[in-house]
Amino acid sequence: MKQRINLVTLGVNDLEKSMEFYQKMGWQTNGIVGTEYENGAVVMFELGGSMMLCLYERKNLAWDSEVALQPASATEFSLGYFVNSQEEVDTVMDRAKKTGANISKPAGQAFWGGYNGYFQDLDGHLWEVGYNPSWKVEE
């Protein structure tokens, strides 16, 4: 198995509301697809290269993976969105707040020398928005 990830799928409670949240954050999608299949409705966001972020109803993800539906937990993992300045972190965090995200940690100086904050989307998924002065993010 080669070291890579092509697809991250987030289990959500309300596909339409979650899609609208990410669209308000500035992400583009062709909308909900796969509705012709039972348990198939999904939203896909192309992230560049061969990487995608998908939204899939939690109950359908449990069905498809044959894993019992579990309570959601925000601390199982976080998604990182890194930018090239502290100002960009502040801009993204402000947009997340205005879009309905829960700001779990306001942006500020990080213990590791950078600048970051955390928010949770409508389903509690944890996003870190950060700036690392030693890491240039390629757009």
Where are these regions (language model features)?
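Alpha-helical elements of the RecA-like P-loop NTPase motor core of helicases
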Residues: 19, 90, 127
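A short, acidic/glycine-rich surface segment
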Residues: 32, 38-39, 60-67, 105, ...
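A short alpha-helix capping/helix-coil boundary motif
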Residues: 21-22, 70-73, 99
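Vicinal oxygen chelate
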Residues: 4-14, 43-46, 53, 66-139
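Core segments of cupin and vicinal oxygen chelate
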Residues: 2, 9-60
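Short, basic, helix/turn surface patches
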Residues: 56-65, 78-81, 130-139
